[in-house]
Design a protein with these regions (language model features):
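Zn-dependent metallo-beta-lactamase
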Residues: 1-22, 27-31, 36-37, 213, ...
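Catalytic core of the metallo-beta-lactamase
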Residues: 7-15, 105-157, 173-182
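Divalent metal-coordination and catalytic microenvironments
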Residues: 14, 24, 56, 63, ...
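Pre-active-site segment of Zn-dependent metallo-hydrolases
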Residues: 16-57, 61-69, 82, 117, ...
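Active-site environment of divalent metal-dependent phosphoester hydrolases
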Residues: 29-30, 58-62, 84-86, 102-105, ...
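Metal-dependent catalytic neighborhoods of phosphoester/phosphodiester hydrolases
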Residues: 63-73, 206-215
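Cap/insert and terminal regions of metallo-dependent hydrolase folds
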Residues: 78-85, 144-240
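Metallo-beta-lactamase
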Residues: 79-132, 221-246
């Protein structure tokens, strides 16, 4: 049976009956970017990967300096168009660049790029394999274009949704990530069997959090929002390293 294991933040390991896909790799930390929760794997302790998908070039979603320690440089990587050069610079050779609604077959797994909106160009993904369909929401805003995902993929088994509602204080509190409540509303549109919140433990550190960033989404608020707007969806809150069959 397919399983998922949270690594940290938006990095998730999806096991489609032995074919493992890693999302948005982030393994190291630096000033202004702290995991805020334990790290379940390092690049060298990961299992053999069938593919890596990466939504955008922000450090906490595309940590190639650290991920370069992963030994299989031929692992297929599916990334937003414009992100491939950096992966090739650190030695990865199997890079495919995509835009929304383009598809890539990686062995028995189908990867479809889907729309997103963030502070930089971004995509989300639908991953299909072993009879399951997974939506990975990276750290997008809740945009109307995501309703098309529900129309094209009417039987989503699992949705991985960001919930911290990140805002940039110096940019007049400009919001760049969906809130827990907006993620609950998106569950109402996508109607997944199971939803798992991601992208909520990150911290920039006490001073930067106070001066630069604002976020307040929690798993509890997400659970409450889903109960109101998508009561048929089961919410599972997972600690890093905790597996879930779906």
């Amino acid at each position: 049976m397919p399983t998922l294991t949270r690594v940290v933040h938006a990095a998730v390991l999806l096991d489609f009956d032995g074919h493992q896909v890693l999302t948005d790799p982030w393994f190291s930390q630096k000033p202004g970017y702290y995991h805020g929760e334990p790290l379940a794997f390092t690049p060298t302790s990961l299992p053999r990967l069938a593919a890596v998908v990466a939504s955008h070039r922000h450090y906490d979603h595309y940590d190639l300096a650290a991920f370069a320690a992963y030994p299989d440089k031929a692992v297929p990587m599916v990334v937003k168009r414009g992100m491939g050069a950096r992966a090739r610079e650190v030695g990865f050779t199997g890079v495919r660049e995509v835009e929304p609604w383009e598809q890539v077959e990686v062995g028995p797994i189908r990867v479809t790029a889907t729309p997103a909106k963030h502070g930089v160009p971004e995509i989300t993904f639908v991953l299909q394999g072993a009879g399951r369909t997974v939506f990975f929401g990276a750290d997008t805003l809740r945009i109307a274009q995501l309703d098309e995902v529900a129309r094209r993929f009417p039987a989503i088994d699992l949705a991985l949704l960001p919930i911290n509602g990140l805002k940039i204080r110096p940019a007049f509190n400009r919001q760049v990530v969906m809130t827990a409540e907006e993620a609950g509303e998106l569950c109402g549109a996508l109607r997944p069997r199971v939803a798992v919140p991601i992208h909520y433990a990150f911290t920039a550190g006490p001073l930067r959090d106070r001066l630069l960033l604002k976020y307040d989404g929690t798993p509890e608020r997400f659970q409450q929002a889903v109960a109101r707007q998508a009561p048929d969806t089961q919410v599972r809150v997972l600690a890093p390293g905790e597996p879930l069959s779906f």
